[in-house]
Amino acid sequence: MASTHDYVKDLRNEDIKIYINGEYHHRSEAKISVFDSGFLLGDGVWEGIRLHNSKLIHLEHHIDRLYDGAKSIAMEIHLSKKEIIEAIWSTLNENNMITDTHIRLIVSRGIKSTPYQHPKVTISLPTIVIIPEYKKANKEVIDRGIRLVSVQTRRDSLVQDPKINSLSKMNCISACIEAEKLGAEEGLMLDPNGFVSTCNSTNFFIITNNEVWTSTGEYCLNGV
């Protein structure tokens, strides 16, 4: 089944190098601790950034959102924004990438002394991972479009702030599974008041009469 994130398979992805805390590892050898907060608890934040013709699209906005999200969960990223940006470019250079690349920037709270949620048992600095992959959009999906269905899973701030790009994606995963069971590729999620909020993996827009309509942004990750 197609999806909004379908891309053209690129064999170069089998040989990429991944950044983990300042070091580069071949994807077959890239590992984090089983005691990492991101693995144990989904405790952290992330951003997805596109490289197009040697330009990182809206880079500063993505980095600002990353740090805002970290601040909202009381997590201090020990590297400055400038250092994070330098690490991204260094990773791209390490892989000789110049375009059609998606970068997954991940920051978890760090390694725990034991599997427990309280930040006080974190015994390391945050774990920073940068995964660059060649991802050129699948033209067949662009031409055909996707099937969208309204799902029962809601976007609600009572449990978790939907404006944070959290590593914990269970809310969106539930909507994704529900949409697939209904024969669609993407789930349209409503807010607690029954209004359109977002999709499970993308923002939602309607373009009509030269106008762009979208949700208020109160119950979804605000787009960049």
Model-derived features with residue positions:
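Conserved alpha/beta cores of soluble small-molecule-handling proteins
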Residues: 1-188, 192-195, 221
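Glycine- and Gly-Pro-enriched alpha-helical subdomains that act as flexible
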Residues: 188, 195-222
